[in-house]
Amino acid sequence: MVIALVVIWIMFSIITDGVFFEPRNLSNLVRQTALIAILAIGMVPVIVTGNIDLSVGSVVGFISIIVAYCQYFIFPDFLGGMFPSLEAQTTFLGIQTSMNGVISTALSIVVAVIAGLLVGLWHGTLIAYLKIPAFIVTLGGYLAFRGGVLLVSGGRTISPVENTLVEIGQGYIPKNIGLILAVLVVACVFVSVMWGRNQKFKYGFEKYPVYRDLLKAAAISAIVMFYVLYIANGYEGIQNPVLLMVIILVIFTYITKNTRFGRYIYAYGGNKEATRLSGINTSLIVFKVYI
């Protein structure tokens, strides 16, 4: 798979006379990959527990169209009527907008989170407690939410939305801040690798030679610095979606490795029956995974 990917990259580089490997193009590819990676992070516990979610793309589309609808049709009139004094244009974190625009974006995020929770509650209840196969439930959700997108939008583009909301998905972090973050990430990588090595020694696990752990940390650090110095700072800086992806990944890693719920997920995925006989509420695990 890796060899095939490298061959494809080389082919596109030859076809485009090297444009494929320019920072601007790689930056756009990383942004698109980050959005998919955020969805993939949420899919990991679903797959680990032996389930599936075919509706994730349709759910994202449905929630996105609800947010756009609220931003275009509901929030401007609602906030403009309640806070007319906040309609004046101003600058917020370097973005030209109004305070009502900032409030609108905050409300949109709340709406998106609530909508996602409701979908998760619905799917989780049907799969975990009513014992309907996940394939059937999420396939139905795939079709239903795709239809919901057409119902809400009427098949038309809903725009424009607030600049602050656009900035979350399309904005960049200043290059100097991105470089500082990269140095911090590299430091955290080495600390994490060495801490993990000490933990293995503490609990009696076999340890690899120290140079292997250092090479592992160095390889990860090299990838991080290459991304920041060549791809990100070679264009406009680190993309906001990439930063969000990293934050979500750190939170997810902590939950799965350092919490009871995370260990329950892996226990369920390893042996469902043994997990149930151990007194763990397996239905609740599946329910939470879909939320």
Predicted regions mapped to residue ranges:
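Membrane-cytosol interface at the C-terminal ends of specific transmembrane alpha-helices
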Residues: V246-G269, V286
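Transmembrane alpha-helices
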Residues: S283-I291
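Alpha-helical transmembrane segments in multi-pass membrane proteins
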Residues: A4, I8, A34-M43, I63-V67, ...
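Transmembrane helix-bundle core of multi-pass membrane transporters
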Residues: M82-M99, Y142-T256
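Single transmembrane alpha-helix segments in multi-pass membrane proteins
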Residues: W9-I14, E22-L79, W122-F135, A274
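Helix-loop-helix hairpins in multi-pass membrane proteins, especially solute transporters
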Residues: T49, A106, I114, L118-G171
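Membrane-interfacial amphipathic/re-entrant helices at transmembrane-helix boundaries
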Residues: M1-I38, I74-L107, E206
